[in-house]
Amino acid sequence: MRKLSFLDRVIEELDSYARFTKVPLNPSKKSPSSDTIDGKLFEIEKKHSAGLMRVDYTGEICAQGLYRGQASVAKSPQTKEHLYHAAAEEYDHLAWCGERLQELGARPSLLNPFWYWTSFGIGAVAGSISDSLSYGFVVETEKQVMKHIDSHLKSLPVNDNRSREILKQMYIDESEHAVEAEKAGGKKLPKTVKAIMKLQSKVMTTLAYRF
């Protein structure tokens, strides 16, 4: 098999990002909300749900960028395969959130290109240092995503049953990803790095909810 050149990799990543921006996306698994019916939602409730789901959509965009950035420079074939597999599973989450946004009459965040490529860069830097550090970023990212999802489940309008089913399944999947990364040798991140990630996450969630 021919080894990909730097230009080949750039083209491959641009093509992958282009796929993420297409609506609708094509998940490998049907949405957990497929067989669920919403109760009556007032416009103000729809707007709030849309803001929350927009944040979750952007969170999945960040996960795609991080994992693909890490995979692009992974030291071992096993790590590369693990990260691309995780990205593929996160793609389903992205599709589910995108579909729900459409149902709510809303759009994804306008800042998603920035968040994707920023996350890709962070992933590439972490991955170039060591696989264990790369896995450590996966663990911390998943834990932060789980906290967001948990808070969103508590904040969703009572009658927003479809969004709730999506987030419940996402929480389960993210938990499994964190455990798998820890088992693969994820290195515990320094407190300073965790603090920076939390700050970045706070900025992202605040902006994505509104824009």
Curated annotation (Swiss-Prot):
Single biological process term from Gene Ontology = ubiquinone biosynthetic process
Known pathway: Cofactor biosynthesis; ubiquinone biosynthesis
Report the co-factor binding details. Answer: Binds 2 iron ions per subunit.
Question: Which cofactors must be present for this protein to function?
Answer: Fe cation
An example of a GO molecular function for this protein is: 3-demethoxyubiquinol 3-hydroxylase activity
Give the reaction(s) catalysed: a 5-methoxy-2-methyl-3-(all-trans-polyprenyl)benzene-1,4-diol + AH2 + O2 = a 3-demethylubiquinol + A + H2O
Task: Give compartment(s).
Answer: Cell membrane
Which top EC class applies here?
A: oxidoreductase
A Pfam family annotated for this chain is: COQ7
Highest taxon listed in the record's lineage: Bacteria
The cysteines joined by S-S bonds are: none
Q: Which residues bind Fe cation 2?
A: E90, E142, E174, H177
Swiss-Prot/TrEMBL keywords: Cell membrane, Iron, Membrane, Metal-binding, Monooxygenase, Oxidoreductase, Ubiquinone biosynthesis
Binding positions for Fe cation 1 per the UniProt entry: E60, E90, H93, E174
Q: Has the keyword Nucleotide-binding been applied to this entry?
A: no
Enzyme Commission identifier(s): 1.14.99.60
* One GO CC term on file: plasma membrane
Q: How is the protein disposed in the membrane?
A: Peripheral membrane protein
Where is the major localization of this protein?
membrane
UniProt xrefs under HAMAP family: COQ7 (MF_01658)
According to its UniProt entry, what is the function of this protein?
Catalyzes the hydroxylation of 2-nonaprenyl-3-methyl-6-methoxy-1,4-benzoquinol during ubiquinone biosynthesis.
Q: Which family does it belong to?
A: Belongs to the COQ7 family.
Q: What is this protein called?
A: 3-demethoxyubiquinol 3-hydroxylase
Q: Which organism is it from?
A: Francisella tularensis subsp. holarctica (strain LVS)
Its organism's taxonomic lineage begins at:
Bacteria, Pseudomonadati, Pseudomonadota, Gammaproteobacteria, Thiotrichales
